[in-house]
């Protein structure tokens, strides 16, 4: 979106596409509203009375403060001088990421280009309250030298988060709510900013990078401020949001009922199946599994999830080419503990892959959480499932051999875990469609993974042994999660203590599996309590978590 108003302080005869009212450019302008600006401002509801006199009429805006238009009217027609060949054309400035519309006389519009802006009476502020018209108002003395600041920080998925921070004595208000001195809150599109008094509305904030909040259900908007898009999938998208009461960041998955229903032969069955899966997943309680916080059933489904700011394991591996073995061990141990918990509660994930493993922070040592239960199945009485689903590269041989027609069990998740561990340790996949001489299906069903000796020279024999015992074609001979947790590579007390310390930091706790004293075939259940977890109900649904 472009801005067309010009600065009163400008002496140039050139018109500018973007606003020149930024103080970083030296001085502010009173808004010289063009018809497009007036239309843009008219989209904001409820500001017409408070903005009276702020934006001039279209007739007023037809004159330039520098006299450019009147000069052009008197210049005789002549050929324009050509630009010398050695002269570089001027490069356009950076596009604004937000715009503040002034609602009162004495205040000016601001296009935000920089990442940080201070507002106040102090001349060091990027937006200084020093205009003569503003000084004559009765509220001028109620404004602090440094009243508030607006800034943005990089969040997950390289998306910026915009905040407003109160530093005033008399208060800064967003949508009539006091922020509080020294406190911050996220600033969403169309927010009203008032100074000193909640009714003294001075600005409307327009985030030029996000959609309008009004497209979301009112009950959702009452509790959450929607922000940037984090990702998208076949059935919807995931957005970052903020809980209004606490300013806590969350992720909200939006499942399109229409798109979801199109994939079902019986649309009437769609809503009950999604709701059933949501209810089951809400009962899962494990520090290494994404937790559903809330659900809104409106025109679409809105599922509120905890936000993992470290991004996907896939991106972490790609960014580092490969992971250190110690880091792999910490992450993989958590994956095993989480999947073991799922299996003991009668759930098979069926789509485990690095994209579905999320990291709690950008730190190398961090918690992981399993997500995307879109392909998950609740085991029935036979403990076998059918249907072909999941990502081909990570599918177990028994799934591909049967084309989804024969039954298969929780061993499919253990195969996928083996593929993930292989990728983390080596930085490349064991099976790939790029091997043109052998099809992906044949590679997997024969168990012939791509082993590059020079890549594995610095990987321990114990780690490689665990990979080999997970990537076994026969599901009956493949290690279970229990057996994998008892593997010598994972008998690392230092790693386990690090995991426990991370849990303490996150205010979580879990009883770790203990290796049996005699044999590795003994079963020791993970001591986690889940109330009301169904264990015999079948469910087929397209996923509640991206």
Swiss-Prot record:
Cysteine pairings via disulfide bonds: none
Free-text activity regulation comment from the record: Activated through phosphorylation at Thr-68 by ATM in response to DNA double-strand breaks. Activation is modulated by several mediators including MDC1 and TP53BP1. Induces homodimerization with exchange of the T-loop/activation segment between protomers and transphosphorylation of the protomers. The autophosphorylated kinase dimer is fully active. Negatively regulated by PPM1D through dephosphorylation of Thr-68.
Compartments, as annotated in UniProt: Nucleus, PML body; Nucleus, Nucleoplasm
Residue ranges constituting the Protein kinase domain according to the UniProt record: 224-490
Residue numbers bearing the Phosphothreonine modification: 68, 77, 387, 391
Annotated positions of the Phosphoserine modification: 71, 82, 383, 460
Protein name as annotated: Serine/threonine-protein kinase Chk2
Organism: Mus musculus (Mouse)
């Amino acid at each position: 979106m472009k801005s067309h108003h010009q600065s009163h302080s400008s002496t140039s005869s050139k018109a500018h596409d973007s606003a020149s009212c930024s103080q970083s450019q030296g001085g502010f302008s009173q808004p010289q509203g063009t018809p497009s600006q007036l239309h843009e401002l008219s989209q904001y509801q409820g500001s017409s009375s408070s903005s009276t006199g702020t934006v001039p009429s279209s007739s007023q805006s037809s004159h330039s403060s520098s006299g450019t238009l009147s000069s052009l009217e008197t210049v005789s027609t002549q050929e324009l001088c050509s630009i010398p060949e050695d002269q570089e054309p001027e490069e356009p400035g950076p596009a604004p990421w937000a715009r503040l519309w002034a609602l009162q006389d004495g205040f000016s519009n601001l296009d935000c280009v920089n990442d940080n802006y201070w507002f106040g009476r102090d001349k060091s502020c990027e937006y200084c309250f020093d205009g003569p018209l503003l000084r004559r108002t009765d509220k001028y003395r109620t404004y602090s030298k440094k009243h508030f600041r607006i800034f943005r920080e990089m969040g997950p998925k390289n998306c910026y988060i915009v905040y407003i921070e109160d530093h005033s004595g008399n208060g800064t208000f967003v949508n009539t709510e006091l922020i509080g001195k020294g406190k911050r809150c996220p600033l969403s599109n169309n927010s009203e900013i008032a100074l000193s008094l909640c009714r003294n509305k001075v600005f409307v904030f327009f985030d030029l990078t996000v959609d309008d909040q009004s497209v979301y259900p009112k009950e959702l908007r009452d509790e959450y401020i929607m922000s940037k898009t984090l990702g998208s999938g076949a059935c919807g998208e995931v957005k970052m949001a903020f809980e209004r009461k606490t300013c806590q960041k969350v992720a909200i998955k939006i499942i399109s009922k229409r798109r979801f229903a199109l994939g079902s032969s019986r649309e009437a069955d769609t809503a009950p199946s999604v709701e059933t899966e949501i209810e089951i997943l809400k009962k899962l309680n494990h520090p290494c599994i994404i937790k559903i916080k809330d659900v809104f059933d409106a025109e679409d489904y809105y599922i509120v999830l905890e936000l993992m700011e470290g991004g996907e394991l896939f991106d972490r591996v790609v960014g580092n080419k490969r992971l250190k073995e110690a880091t792999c061990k910490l992450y993989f141990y958590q994956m095993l503990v989480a999947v073991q918990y799922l299996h003991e509660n009668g759930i098979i994930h069926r789509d485990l892959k690095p994209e579905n493993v999320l990291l709690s922070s950008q730190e190398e040592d961090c918690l992981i959480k399993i997500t995307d239960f879109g392909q998950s199945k609740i085991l029935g009485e036979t403990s076998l499932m059918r249907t072909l689903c999941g990502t081909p590269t990570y599918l177990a041989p028994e799934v591909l051999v049967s084309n989804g027609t024969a039954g298969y069990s929780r061993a499919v998740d253990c195969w996928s875990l083996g593929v993930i561990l292989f990728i983390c340790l080596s930085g490349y996949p064991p099976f790939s469609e790029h091997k043109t001489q052998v099809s992906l299906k044949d590679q997997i069903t024969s168990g012939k993974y791509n082993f590059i000796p020079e890549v594995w020279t610095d990987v321990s024999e114990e780690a490689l042994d665990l990979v080999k015992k997970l990537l076994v074609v026969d599901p009956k001979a493949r290690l279970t999660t229990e057996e994998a947790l008892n593997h010598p590579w994972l008998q690392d007390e230092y790693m386990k203590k690090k995991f426990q310390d991370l849990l303490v930091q996150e205010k979580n706790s879990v009883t770790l599996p203990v290796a049996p004293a005699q044999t590795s075939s003994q079963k020791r259940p993970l001591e986690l309590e889940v109330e009301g977890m169904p264990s015999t109900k079948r469910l087929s649904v397209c996923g509640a978590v991206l």
